[in-house]
Design a protein with these regions (language model features):
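Short Gly/Ser/Thr- and charged-rich N-terminal loops/segments
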Residues: 4-14
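Phosphate/pyrophosphate-binding loop motifs in nucleotide- or prenyl diphosphate-using proteins
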Residues: 18-206
């Protein structure tokens, strides 16, 4: 049975994971350090698959934090789209590739292309980057850098997971592009808010 029919995309992912529209938040089934993947497989909560989609969830929270700031409406729209895609990725990573028969939302090539197009548009208005940039400038820019670092961690974990289990290659590509997008977004927001972009000057002994 496809539980995703006629539900908004974000709700679809939650219903895929929870399998029912109404369920208690606490189940007590994880009290001994195990949790269930989509498909029913029980694994330790420190399993790399759990680490992977847990880090994607952490990333999504940071994306939400950025979207709540006073930034351009267009950026907010794109960030909400990214949040939806991260739920899709979370559902994909939470499914046991060998046992899950439930329909999981799809990540598309168009989702990756959107990030690339957004980066290209933002870069048109930015000064050429000739040096490494120190994270910071103002609070919102710093949030972008925090999200970027969490995104890189999520990417590293999914790459490690893919060495021993199936992971849709579009997932790792999307996370790679997203970390770049967050870097460019931070620069764009910094430029729009007249934040100082501090460059890294290596200290070299003469």
């Amino acid at each position: 049975m496809d539980l995703t029919t006629n539900l908004p995309s974000g709700r679809r992912t939650y219903n895929v994971i929870l399998k029912t529209p109404k369920m208690k938040i606490y189940t007590k089934t994880g009290d001994k350090g195990l949790t269930s993947l989509i498909g029913g497989t029980r694994v330790a909560k420190h399993h790399i698959r759990i680490e992977s989609y847990g880090t994607v969830d952490e990333l999504n929270s940071y994306i939400g934090l950025i979207a709540c700031q006073e930034i351009e409406a267009h950026h907010q729209i794109i960030l909400k789209e990214i949040q939806d895609r991260l739920f899709t990725i979370g559902a994909s990573l939470a499914a046991d590739p060998e046992k899950s028969k439930m329909k999981i939302p799809d990540l598309l090539e168009e989702d990756i292309l959107l990030l690339e197009q957004e980066m290209d548009k933002m870069n048109e208005d930015l000064p050429e980057l000739k040096h490494f940039v120190l994270p910071g400038g103002n609070t919102i820019v710093s949030y972008c850098h925090l999200a970027r670092c969490v995104c890189r961690r999520a990417e590293r974990l999914t790459v490690a997971l893919a060495e021993g289990s199936f992971v849709d290659t579009k997932v790792t590509v999307y996370l790679n592009r997203l970390s770049d997008y967050l870097f460019v977004l931070g620069r764009k927001i910094g430029d729009d808010t007249n934040a100082v972009e501090n460059i890294w000057v290596p200290r070299v002994k003469s």
